[in-house]
Amino acid sequence: MTMKQVTTKTTRRWALLRAAMLTLLFASCHLGVTAQEVMDIISKNPAYASCNYNLYPDSVTFQMTAPPKGKRPFYISHYGRHGSRYISNRKGYDIPYLMMLHADSLDELTPMGERVLEEMKLIMTDSENRWGELTSSGLEQHRRIARNMVERFPEVLGGKTTVTARSTIVTRCMMSMAAAMMELMQINPELQISMEASKSTMRYMNHQDKELKKSQMTPEAKKAYNKYTAKRGGNKRLMELLFLNPDIVDEVVDEQQFNYYLMKMGLFQLHTHLNKNTYLTDIFTTEELYRMWQIDNALWYIQHGACKLNGGRQPYSQRYLLRQIIADADSCIRLEKPGTQLRFGHETVLLPLVCLLGINGYDLETDNLDDLEKEGWWCSSVFPMGSNVQFIFYRSDWRDKDVLVKVLLNEKEATLPIRTNCAPYYRWSDFKRYYLKKLNLYDKRK
């Protein structure tokens, strides 16, 4: 072996070692988070317990890994959830509210129970005819995310460039899109912005696969879920706190449903202008909120994760969206200055998309619901109100064919299950090959 061959071989080994170390570093970031107790997070941020009603952080710490030498961002592709909103319909509030009214009619409320009922009346009045509407907090979340995008990637959003925005035909998504676009325009008036909300794009913007949905709660999944939740539902302490004779009101108050939906009512309030009034949330202990999180987290995994209890296919509900993202990117990267493509939708799209991509290990496959917490499958971290996945593309100039892509989950660098020697950057050719193969295999098995 010549000296040149030895040097080349050594260089290659160092490159592979560096890639392995970087991949391990980014994986450990995720594992480090999962090592924390969820209860500790909930004690600081009770909204975390509500899973898909979690609050988007007021500030995000930017810790950006420098791209390989000469590479610069040139295109952004994105899918984001609408911002904070009111509860979609009054049913979730009516369940605990009507139970409390019935107990009150029987004179069975304690002084604490009477105070809680007054708080519930206040929330019901504030929410009436606002079901599902975006709140002022929701608008601000998208303005802030847009500002951050410009601040971090001025190469993409500076000067006279194009921003194409699409949303589902749901009002809160359209308003989220409008808030973000207005903020971008205010920062850079030269932007060429177009917005669209059309039924023609709903096939990939908000695809709800009926066949997959039918197979979510298989007998095996239902048995496992019921066993998992049996030891976590209910709240005798709460019943004794609010009702004079819990045994009597047991006939009109379903303990498990009451506990669950009263918690939701209090936590949802954190998204509205009543967010300074945390009385309903404060009546629950951190452990009680934690148990509710466990119940919800397991259900979201069954419904949208790669859960072995129902075949592990649920993330493929977003196969059309992923194909569209790939096709759009392939088209855009041919341009000298492709700009930005933003999409605004829902958490029932974003969560399975994250699982389909395997971002930060969310492609976890298990039939043991007790594994979720220790493995770091925490849905609250994926889809708070305003959550987003950003694909940032890099190259040296428009002639550069070696395009790289980096993924941000809620504005933080994330990992993918793809080999790379420059994590968290991945070759676009590898990205395409990996995911198109995955999607094609699924289509063949259908």
Region spans (language model):
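Signature for phosphate-centric chemistry
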Residues: Q36-T162, T168-Q341, G345-K446
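Bacterial Sec-dependent N-terminal signal peptides
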Residues: M1-V38
